[in-house]
Amino acid sequence: MIHLEKLEQARHLVASSDLDVWLTFVRETTALCDPVLPLICDFGMTWQSAFIVAKSGMTFAVVGNYDADAIRQLGGWNQVVPYVHSIQDRLIAVLELTIPTSVTKPRIGINTSESDDKADGITLGMFHLLTSMLEGTRFEGCLVSASNVVIPLRAQKTEAELDAIEDAIQVTEGIFDWLTSTYVQIGMSEYQIYSGIQSLIDERGYSYGWERAGNPIVNCGPDSQAGHGLPSNQITLNQGHILHIDLGIATRKYSSDIQRCWYVGKSVPNHIQHAMAAVVSAIDAAAAVLRPGIQGWMVDAAARDAITAAGYPEYMHAVGHQVGRFAHDGGTLLGPQWDRYGNAPDGVVQPREVYTLELGVEIPDAGVVSIEEMVVITADGCEFLTQRQTEMWLLAR
């Protein structure tokens, strides 16, 4: 089970960190769940619950009495501590047990981050509640960010996680093959293409890498809405158009995020071939420098320099993001040092992280040429997980 692998990984991360304990504090997770919780406890909670990983390697789950048996059955927690009336006394007792009195200023890591939504899982209300519970104890004023544990825990994939991601990629590539060999017809609207893909996903029991509404992104020709838009019933696929699709499938709770494009016609015009070659070369430039130890913004700069050197405007987004349980999975971002990205582009790439490499250019008379690949970081570089698209494909049906 993946959560057992991730708990073991968490033990090592906490042991090597500046934290005394890492504390994930949640309640009623049906509508609002801390993004890290499914990594370490793949079970929805009902009452206030505290999941603690100590520097010693011991793990504790302080949970409501009716949740306790399920957490024991999941395994991985050294002690499951149930409560009925209030979590406060049990939680403080576990902190006393795990943090020696010789530690004069304990560091209790909680899930907060100003730059990473996947590491920012504690709500403001739960933060205030936890703060009030610790008042008057030796742990008052000891809450700090655990992003130095949460971010690498999510980012650095286990073998089981990589296997699930590769499965999602294969499913996505299979849907692209089905789409152009069987389903898509010239004259179809964006919405028809979008609905057909969703029907196949639902029929086969897959999930979505991001919200169902707007997945996949479908663009037909030059009049289509760029970016994360909704498909149109009025815009149709015609001769001379580029069909562009951005699709993220989730299988076994892990996602893909892949973009592909096709030209509608008997042959690809030279100016579109040139654009495609420039996009592929920019992805190559990013892949050439993507390796452990490099900062995310440096990878983006390599791709940005390549696309502008080819005569095209720079893209208005990051060249790559991490993929895991979600298509956009937080952590180090392969993006420019813009305010909107916080410190994510300053992060350092590490082995076993999975990233996209993506960018595109708009062709005024045809549509968007945009490709998105997926790679995994190796010991000294990166390896493509997707079957690459390196030339514009033709769609003549």
Which ranges hold each PLM region?
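Active-site neighborhoods and metal-handling regions in enzymes and metal-associated proteins
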Residues: 1-397
